[in-house]
From Swiss-Prot:
Annotated gene: argF
Any single Gene Ontology cellular-component annotation: cytoplasm
Cellular location(s): Cytoplasm
InterPro entries per the UniProt record, alphabetical: Asp/Orn_carbamoyltranf_P-bd, Asp/Orn_carbamoylTrfase, Asp/Orn_carbamoylTrfase_sf, Asp_carbamoyltransf_Asp/Orn-bd, Orn/put_carbamltrans, OTCase_ArgI
GO process annotations (BP): arginine biosynthetic process via ornithine; citrulline biosynthetic process; L-arginine biosynthetic process
Entry protein name: Ornithine carbamoyltransferase
Reaction catalyzed: carbamoyl phosphate + L-ornithine = L-citrulline + phosphate + H(+)
Pathway: Amino-acid biosynthesis; L-arginine biosynthesis; L-arginine from L-ornithine and carbamoyl phosphate: step 1/3
Protein purpose: Reversibly catalyzes the transfer of the carbamoyl group from carbamoyl phosphate (CP) to the N(epsilon) atom of ornithine (ORN) to produce L-citrulline.
Transmembrane segments annotated in the record for this chain: none
Entry similarity comment: Belongs to the aspartate/ornithine carbamoyltransferase superfamily. OTCase family.
Length: 309
């Protein structure tokens, strides 16, 4: 059987995304109600990038599903030398039930998935962060009810993985997504086009703007992320000056709907992309969002493994 992979947010159809989110809600209520890895069976969890939430949530989640996480710095394997991704994928597929990889280039994940005979999950790449957006959607649903028809505004670096995933995952759920970003930091055109194609089937919309205040006005959900993603620390670009108008502060929050919620995938650079007042304020659901990484990823793994059986 050809495995299902989760490499980008639109790998799930709207109905499939809804199934995963419903299961995530069930697992949050009863963490041990699904045990697809009973045995324990193994899951490879590979890291090319440092991690806190991704590592803890996957390790704990795999254990709660009855399995064993084999956590490895990918650079310490033959991947860090000269073994091909395809050969690594074929070998790991003989040992484990799924492969989770946090890496840089999306094409490496796609090469791994092309050769693997078990599900491959994108735990973060430079282009997408789909597991995080499942957790975001779960948090939004918990606080806002139905997702379809909500208005969400992302502020900041529109060219980063969160902006891309929020577009694709958001419109899949029927959410109207606005990306407010300065010139030179807008989403990749091919991902905007993909999001708009998906939006045609869900009634959602994708809007790009450089006007943060107009973008925030009346929305139900405000989202931001770091202005400097991992690997960009030494790229020589000024990532502060162009982003200051996009800082998620009390002034911008006041423009949103009075019941609007605030999300940040973390880690946060307090005082830069988000203020302490907003991060710790009544609109923030950041800690629910972070917790939901555990539940959403367990649901995703369970859903994928059920289709592998």
């Amino acid at each position: 059987m050809t495995p299902r992979h989760f490499l980008r947010d639109d790998d799930l159809s709207p109905a499939e995304q809804a199934e995963v989110l419903a299961l995530a809600a069930e697992l949050k209520k009863d963490p041990f109600s699904a045990r697809p890895l009973e045995g324990p069976r193994g899951v490879a969890v590979l890291f090319d990038k440092n991690s806190t939430r991704t590592r803890f949530s996957f390790e704990v989640g795999i254990a709660q599903l009855g399995g064993h996480a084999v956590v490895v710095d990918a650079r310490s394997t033959q991947l860090g030398r000269d073994e091909t991704l395809e050969d690594t994928a074929r070998v790991l597929s003989r040992y484990v039930e799924a492969i989770v990889w946090r890496t840089f280039e999306q094409h490496r994940l796609e090469a791994m998935a092309g050769a693997a005979t078990v599900p491959v999950i994108n735990a973060l790449s430079d282009e997408f962060h789909p597991c995080q957006v499942l957790a975001d959607l779960q948090a939004i649903a918990e606080h806002k009810g139905s997702l379809s028809g909500l208005r969400m505004c992302y502020l900041g670096d529109g060219a980063n993985n969160m902006a891309h995933s929020l577009m694709l995952g958001g419109v899949t759920a029927g959410i109207h997504v606005t990306i407010a970003a300065p010139d030179g930091f807008t989403p990749a055109p091919e991902f905007v086009a993909a999001a708009r194609r998906r939006a045609e089937s869900t009634g959602a919309t994708v809007t790009l703007t450089t006007d943060a205040r107009t973008a925030a006005r009346g929305v139900d959900v405000l989202v931001t992320d770091t202005w400097t993603s991992m690997g960009q620390e030494d790229d020589g670009l000024d990532r502060r000056t162009p982003f200051w108008p996009y800082q998620l502060n009390a002034d911008l929050v006041s423009l949103a709907d009075p019941e609007a919620i605030v999300l940040h995938c973390l880690p946060a650079h307090r005082g830069e992309e988000i203020t302490d007042e907003v991060m710790d304020g009544p609109s923030s659901v950041v800690w629910d969002e972070a917790e939901n990484r555990l539940h959403a990823q367990k649901a995703l793994l369970t859903w994928l493994l059920e289709r592998q059986a």
